[in-house]
Amino acid sequence: MPTINQLVRKNRKQKKSQSKSPVLEKCPQKQGVCLQVRTMTPKKPNSALRKITRVRLSNGKEVTVYIPGEGHNLQEHSIVLVRGGRVRDLPGVRYQVVRGSRDALGVDGRKQSRSRYGAKK
């Protein structure tokens, strides 16, 4: 416990909260170019081939981005919009592609939560 004198000399420091999506630089989304599109296996106890892509953002930073929904049309040099939002069973994946925007088509045949997947009615 510090004395009053110590607090007068050097006051208490506020803890700064660290951003969960630092490369977006406080923007809601950022545009980027796909460098490679591949799959990744999730942590235990899950088992699948999750679709991911490596993206170079407009600020020059590279991130691993998850492609949500069933099926996609992304390939190398596709332009995508990237938003924050981690995927719990993929370590190191903290961003997601916005479906239905730029080169990423929406999920066709989607009936529920369509706005998340860029699906038309």
Curated annotation (Swiss-Prot):
Q: GO: which molecular function terms? A: rRNA binding; structural constituent of ribosome; tRNA binding
- Disordered: annotated segments: 1-25
Q: Please provide one cellular component term from the Gene Ontology annotations of this protein.
A: small ribosomal subunit
Q: Tell me the superkingdom of the source.
A: Bacteria
Q: Where is the signal peptide?
A: none
Q: Which biological processes are named by the entry's GO terms? A: translation
For bias type Basic residues, the affected ranges are 9-18
PROSITE patterns the UniProt entry points to: RIBOSOMAL_S12
Q: Which UniProt keywords apply?
A: Methylation, Ribonucleoprotein, Ribosomal protein, RNA-binding, rRNA-binding, tRNA-binding
Does Ribosomal protein count among this protein's keywords?
Answer: yes
The reply to whether Lipid biosynthesis figures as a keyword in the UniProt entry is no
Question: Residues where 3-methylthioaspartic acid occurs?
Answer: 89
Subunit record text: Part of the 30S ribosomal subunit. Contacts proteins S8 and S17. May interact with IF1 in the 30S initiation complex.
Give the family per the record: Belongs to the universal ribosomal protein uS12 family.
What does the protein in this record do? With S4 and S5 plays an important role in translational accuracy. Interacts with and stabilizes bases of the 16S rRNA that are involved in tRNA selection in the A site and with the mRNA backbone. Located at the interface of the 30S and 50S subunits, it traverses the body of the 30S subunit contacting proteins on the other side and probably holding the rRNA structure together. The combined cluster of proteins S8, S12 and S17 appears to hold together the shoulder and platform of the 30S subunit.
The record's HAMAP family line, in alphabetical order, gives: Ribosomal_uS12_B
Q: Could you tell me what this protein is called?
A: Small ribosomal subunit protein uS12
Protein source organism: Rhodopirellula baltica (strain DSM 10527 / NCIMB 13988 / SH1)
